[in-house]
Amino acid sequence: MNIFRFLGDISHLSAIIILLLKIWKSRSCAGISGKSQLLFAIVFTTRYLDLFTNFISFYNTSMKVVYVASSYATVWMIYSKFKATYDGNHDTFRVEFLIVPTAILSFLVNHDFTPLEILWTFSIYLESVAILPQLFMVSKTGEAETITSHYLFALGIYRTLYLFNWIWRYQFEEFFDLIAIVAGLVQTVLYCDFFYLYITKVLKGKKLSLPA
């Protein structure tokens, strides 16, 4: 495992911890898109169906368990534990416009036409756009809490570091996964505007807002 993947995993874990602590400590999921969290739960479920059949390392298996468990814990807190604080009026992105096209694409463009491989490919495509409901929600409300901004920034850094991970693997391992690279590029591009606002506003102590 190279340093970029390790740092990417740390950034991803940081994002998860930030989100879970934000919801649990404030006893509120206000400002958090339940739809994005549902999409992430679908992403990790379909990606790690090989959890009990394909052992690579303790680290790898542990990360899979953490991602799946934390995604469902987040969904549970939003739609059950703290349901009264969920802002469904602003979380209105039509997720079927993300799920259906990525599902179709996973059947058309994949590495191997087998159930597990198609589901893995679907998870890669879906993850690249899963944050859109959250960004759409921030755009509709006009602002985001600072802690929510930290969560989004950590997620964006995770994806950016994973792009460097693919570059490193191509350079030193001659491993090239076009599907993962293109999906990662799409996801990173979606965060670009947010990165700019985060650096120019949040890091200067101002509240983040996206243009409506």
Swiss-Prot record:
Residues 204-207 are annotated as: Important for recycling of cargo proteins with the sequence motif K-D-E-L from the Golgi to the endoplasmic reticulum. It is found in: Golgi apparatus membrane; Cytoplasmic vesicle, COPI-coated vesicle membrane; Endoplasmic reticulum membrane; Endoplasmic reticulum-Golgi intermediate compartment membrane. The record marks 193 as: Important for recycling of cargo proteins with the sequence motif K-D-E-L from the Golgi to the endoplasmic reticulum. Disulfide bonds: none annotated. Residues 1-4, 53-58, 111-116, 169-178 are lumenal. Belongs to the ERD2 family. This is ER lumen protein-retaining receptor 1-B. It comes from Xenopus laevis (African clawed frog).
